[in-house]
């Protein structure tokens, strides 16, 4: 499965870092807004102030964590594309596993293995859903079979013309 909308490999890393940062800031902002609202003292003004304060403090940190994950994932993915010479779902699955392992490298080895497995499984699920959606939607865009004419108007297989046409077999 080939993706045509992706940037070439050196720029893909920057593109994925920016996209991951944006996802982290938006998603983290929504989550932190709810969390800050719920944990603030009673009163609408206090709750709104707590919500904005939580977003201001935590959303950039969450976005940065997402950007690190996206950058490392894309770097490993581009390295595998270069090493293997082809771009397929196995690169993404392996990149997810290696990214999980590298980001958990400061922990105990068991946590590193667990993070690698979770990264690989998560990317395998994402790639599998992508392949299924591609196959499902590809059926919608197949060319329709050509319109068949009325078989009675087509010449017969023996070379005799259909009704209303003169026979030229005598001139052969």
Swiss-Prot record:
Membrane topology category: Multi-pass membrane protein
UniProt keywords, alphabetically: Disulfide bond, Membrane, Mitochondrion, Mitochondrion inner membrane, Protein transport, Translocation, Transmembrane, Transmembrane helix, Transport
Main location: mitochondrion
MF terms (GO), sorted A to Z: protein transmembrane transporter activity
InterPro entries: Tim17 (IPR005678)
Gene Ontology cellular component list: TIM23 mitochondrial import inner membrane translocase complex
Disulfide bridge positions per record: 9-78
Residue spans crossing the bilayer: 17-37, 61-77, 113-133
Quaternary structure, from the entry: Component of the TIM23 complex at least composed of TIMM23, TIMM17 (TIMM17A or TIMM17B) and TIMM50. The complex interacts with the TIMM44 component of the PAM complex and with DNAJC15.
Function: Essential component of the TIM23 complex, a complex that mediates the translocation of transit peptide-containing proteins across the mitochondrial inner membrane.
Similarity remark: Belongs to the Tim17/Tim22/Tim23 family.
Name of the protein: Mitochondrial import inner membrane translocase subunit Tim17-B
Record organism: Bos taurus
